[in-house]
Curated annotation (Swiss-Prot):
The keyword Transferase applies. The gene is fmt. This is Methionyl-tRNA formyltransferase. Pfam families: Formyl_trans_C, Formyl_trans_N. Belongs to the Fmt family. Transmembrane segments: none annotated. Attaches a formyl group to the free amino group of methionyl-tRNA(fMet). The formyl group appears to play a dual role in the initiator identity of N-formylmethionyl-tRNA by promoting its recognition by IF2 and preventing the misappropriation of this tRNA by the elongation apparatus.
Length: 322
């Protein structure tokens, strides 16, 4: 089976790797990914992980800025005469002309149990919304945003303290396995695409800076879900500085001691030896385990207490201009 792979970030790597395994029945004849972009604090221009892997295997790579407006790339894709296009976190919408090219269609690996969490950030929003289960879906792509007919699905539990990055790693691996199963069954004609029930659709929009700001008026559980979903990017104000809250503890697993004072939302109300600090919220108190001060490396909350940067009575606050 001749495959063109569309994918860019780390999440796409396991799917590309499994197609490239020795004795694989699949022949990857091309990779399409996003252009090299500045990354990290140094803003060094780096290639996508999928590009590095493809080039190591001698696979041709295309990196159009706008696929639908690049006639040379479109012509090259047509000339490859692929049986199927596989799309895993590519980062662009495939135009109708591309969707119609491969004989068996375009197969997408999406990190949710569609029709739930259509969109760009399904992993993070599932955690932020307090879901206890998610999964991966392979679907036959159409012109809509994650609206194609479902081929196969696999469920995974979301653990109470699991972060978005941790869950993404699991889903990427499970998605790769499901992709192989999908392609094998598709070639044999053993799959019946099932249309999605649009009435049950929910959405996972692209993340914005405001999504990372912590509002201590919210309940402890909601804040914990937000912190782990978007880790390590959630932030709050502390004495005029912007501080990142990297890790918290699940309230149901680490309830505050009965003698802990209630405090006002955002106030550091107690210490947990070897664990962190308790912060009052709109409903209950939340145990904060790890944080990061401006210009510093991530530290345990206990180290911040020992260093005098954090103490009982201090108050986290919403920043006016995140």
């Amino acid at each position: 089976m001749r495959v063109v792979f569309f994918g860019t970030p780390e999440f796409a790597l396991p799917s590309l790797q499994i197609l490239l395994q020795p004795q694989s029945p699949f022949e990857v004849v091309g990779l399409v990914c996003q252009p090299d972009r500045p990354q990290g604090r140094g803003q060094k221009v780096l290639p996508p992980p999928t590009k590095i892997l493809a080039q190591a295997h001698g696979i041709p790579v295309w990196q159009p800025g706008r696929l639908r407006r690049d006639p040379e790339v479109l012509a090259a894709l047509e000339a490859l005469a692929a049986d199927v296009f596989v799309v895993v976190a590519y980062g662009q919408i495939l135009p109708p002309a591309v969707l119609q090219m491969p004989k068996l269609g375009c197969i997408n690996v999406h990190a949710s149990l569609l029709p739930a969490y259509r969109g760009a950030a399904p992993i993070q929003w599932a955690i932020a919304n307090g879901e206890t289960e998610t999964g991966v879906t392979t679907m036959l792509m159409d012109e809509g945003m994650d609206t194609g007919a479902i081929l196969l699905q696999a469920k995974l539990p979301i653990e109470p303290e699991q972060t978005g990055l941790e869950l993404a790693s699991q889903l990427a691996q499970r998605g790769a396995e499901l992709l192989v199963e999908t392609l094998v069954k598709l070639e044999k004609g053993e799959l019946t695409p099932i249309p999605q029930d649009d009435s049950r659709a929910t959405y996972a929009p692209l993340l914005k800076k405001q999504d990372f700001q912590l509002d201590w008026q919210r309940p402890a559980q909601a804040l914990h879900n937000q912190i782990r979903a978007f880790s390590p990017d959630c932030f709050t104000g502390l004495q005029g500085q912007r501080i990142k809250i990297v890790r918290s503890a699940a309230p149901q697993l680490h309830p505050p001691p009965a003698e802990l004072p209630p405090g006002s939302p955002g106030e550091v109300v107690g210490l947990a030896r070897g664990e962190g600090v308790y912060v009052a919220t709109g409903e209950g108190s939340l145990l904060i385990r790890r944080a990061q001060l401006p210009g510093r490396k991530e530290q345990s909350a206990c180290d911040l207490v020992n260093g005098g940067q954090l103490r009982v009575g201090m108050r986290f606050e919403v920043l006016p201009d995140p």
